[in-house]
Amino acid sequence: MINIAIDAMGGDFGEKPIIEGVLKALEAKPFNAILVGNSKILKPLIPKKLEQYIQYEEASEIFSMNENATDALKNKETTIYKAINLLKEKKVDAVVSAGHSGASMSLATLRLGRLKGISRPAIATLMPNIINKTLLLDVGANTDCKAENLFQFAIMGEVYARAIMQIQKPRLALLSNGEEECKGNELTKESHQLMKKIPNFIGNAEGRDIFNGEIDVLVCDGFDGNVILKACEGVATAIFQLLKNEVKQSFISKIGALLMKPSFKKLKKHTDWQEYGGAPLLGVNGCVIISHGKSDSRAIKNAIFQAINFSQSHINELIENELGKYNA
């Protein structure tokens, strides 16, 4: 059975939504949960019927969202340090944390190390499109990149799309300010030349192409990726708020909204980041799923499902094998 370490107290809302998410996941799939935190606080939240699947790793401190990520290595008593250390010692198969994302990245990279052939890890996230989903990476691990970094991101994204998204030949694109090969800055142009080696590379793509369903994996540096991610979150929130405002304008609008309610629910679910759970940190020697600090129980549950799928798919081995084809 898969063993997953959960940073049980690192989110913005404390341990309650995290534990609720763990319990929901346990009711749906079998795995062993190692809760990292204060067991005196956590144990009363666990029902007797699920106690057999729960273990505890004591951690007396929480790495604050206000702390600098570079300080994560200094305090070995934090929940995120203890969780990552369990993975380093091979006592668990994966880590899920809704705590300080910078600390998670820093600890995972320095404590676990990088995969063979990977110079920098990348955070990957799923973005909804009109047909299914697009994998976007990097969305925050690296604000400044070299062309070789983006090439490695492309390989990792392609492998993830095949293994997890079940896309046999994922369409891979590079984010730029135009589709033409000559468009973009020096980084984009140099990266484009490297990515030509990849059979499934379809060329440059613009920001609007994320949502048309014609791209499965979109590669960019962490600065652009994070801006895109946050902008999309804001746009989605604004659109739903505008719809609510318009519905209130007349009785006919309210009737129409009532008739459209099932469709609105499907749309909201498709665009809701909580449905995707978390973002895998690709390129480190282990499975680390980084969840949003504001994750509710549903997001934590889905992040755990991601961790299970990642662990069972042997993605890291596949990434090293795929990179080996180009480095040989």
Curated annotation (Swiss-Prot):
Catalyzes the reversible formation of acyl-phosphate (acyl-PO(4)) from acyl-[acyl-carrier-protein] (acyl-ACP). This enzyme utilizes acyl-ACP as fatty acyl donor, but not acyl-CoA. Pathway: Lipid metabolism; phospholipid metabolism. The keyword Cytoplasm applies. SUPFAM superfamilies: Isocitrate/Isopropylmalate dehydrogenase-like. GO terms for cellular component: cytoplasm. GO terms for biological process: fatty acid biosynthetic process; phospholipid biosynthetic process. Keywords: Cytoplasm, Lipid biosynthesis, Lipid metabolism, Phospholipid biosynthesis, Phospholipid metabolism, Transferase. It is found in: Cytoplasm. Homodimer. Probably interacts with PlsY. This is Phosphate acyltransferase. Its EC number is 2.3.1.274. Transmembrane segments: none annotated. It comes from Campylobacter jejuni subsp. jejuni serotype O:6 (strain 81116 / NCTC 11828). Disulfide bonds: none annotated.
